[in-house]
Amino acid sequence: MKGNSTLATTSKNITSGLHFGLVNISGNNESTLNCSQKPSDKHLDAIPILYYIIFVIGFLVNIVVVTLFCCQKGPKKVSSIYIFNLAVADLLLLATLPLWATYYSYRYDWLFGPVMCKVFGSFLTLNMFASIFFITCMSVDRYQSVIYPFLSQRRNPWQASYIVPLVWCMACLSSLPTFYFRDVRTIEYLGVNACIMAFPPEKYAQWSAGIALMKNILGFIIPLIFIATCYFGIRKHLLKTNSYGKNRITRDQVLKMAAAVVLAFIICWLPFHVLTFLDALAWMGVINSCEVIAVIDLALPFAILLGFTNSCVNPFLYCFVGNRFQQKLRSVFRVPITWLQGKRESMSCRKSSSLREMETFVS
């Protein structure tokens, strides 16, 4: 009975559809035995196509960001360094999507061997954390720029040279469990060789719950606290400033951008992390309903998909809205760009230090 329980637990882990080890959906061993019937996978038909769409769009827009940074002459700003590293993390994350699209197409049958399973699973987790961590760094940097504009003008790129390696190291450490446990296992009742988190069978529930909660805390709760605090601080500070006429329009645009950053992060990642938390509750035995577990398994692939769209949105939030983006695009690609002009051309040159700093993050 114990062997069957372990097999059912491992098998149910596959049906969750989380191919890169961000979380594992199931209940405890007893509930897993009751829910171990083969699930319907018709809802997965659209996932590979959507993955390829996100891959193409995200890859193109992030390549533009990286190209602009590499072609930029003169010293780099701290904010530009963060944007560049964010784009690199998003590019590396998106580069793995064709493999996972194939994985979905073959209904969790991994065709690329155990080494690629471990490497690409770890690669995806690492760059997911790196992307989120750099978004957090940029929120803190923007807060300092707006609240303390004169001090922020003294920032030097060497300061970012210490923070950037630290962020990448933190992302690497956060992905170590995936690197250690990710492996290919044969799931006989599904007839596949699946790329899964191969936790020790006797401690499968504990490991799954622990990893799920770790993803919640490091990948969402702590970053969201920093991001929301920084942008609400920016909003509070700017609303106190006496802005009139065109400066008021500029201030309102900055406030809208700050709100968009917070909302984009929440919309893209909240569904995934809610399901991750429910997964942890299932592994701890708090959730024992087969119906609830089935709903989680059904929704999870689409929640992951929504999380990946954040890598497509980031360039628009952090780079393309920059005050000098059009000039950079003209100089690098030698093409006329007019779609972002609008009201910015008519802005008064007399702006507060806070607003001017916010407008030139990617100069």
Curated annotation (Swiss-Prot):
Membrane topology recorded in Swiss-Prot or TrEMBL: Multi-pass membrane protein
Cellular component, GO, one term: plasma membrane
Gene3D superfamilies: Rhodopsin 7-helix transmembrane proteins
Keywords: Cell membrane, Disulfide bond, G-protein coupled receptor, Glycoprotein, Membrane, Receptor, Transducer, Transmembrane, Transmembrane helix
Tissue and organ distribution: In adult, highly expressed in myometrium with lower levels in adrenal gland and fallopian tube. Expressed in the cerebellum. Very highly expressed in fetal kidney and intestine.
Result, substituting residue 108 to A: Abolished angiotensin II-binding
Outcome when changing residue 215 to A/Q: Abolished angiotensin II-binding
Effect of residue 21 to V: Found in patients with X-linked intellectual disability; uncertain significance
Segments in the Cytoplasmic topological domain: 71-80, 141-159, 233-257, 321-363
Gene Ontology biological-process annotations: angiotensin-mediated vasodilation involved in regulation of systemic arterial blood pressure; blood vessel remodeling; brain development; brain renin-angiotensin system; cell surface receptor signaling pathway; exploration behavior; G protein-coupled receptor signaling pathway; G protein-coupled receptor signaling pathway coupled to cGMP nucleotide second messenger
Disulfide bonds: 35-290, 117-195
GO molecular function: angiotensin type II receptor activity; receptor antagonist activity
Known role: Receptor for angiotensin II, a vasoconstricting peptide. Signals primarily via a non-canonical G-protein- and beta-arrestin independent pathways. Cooperates with MTUS1 to inhibit ERK2 activation and cell proliferation.
Name of the protein in question: Type-2 angiotensin II receptor
Organismal lineage: Eukaryota, Metazoa, Chordata, Craniata, Vertebrata
Gene coding for it: AGTR2
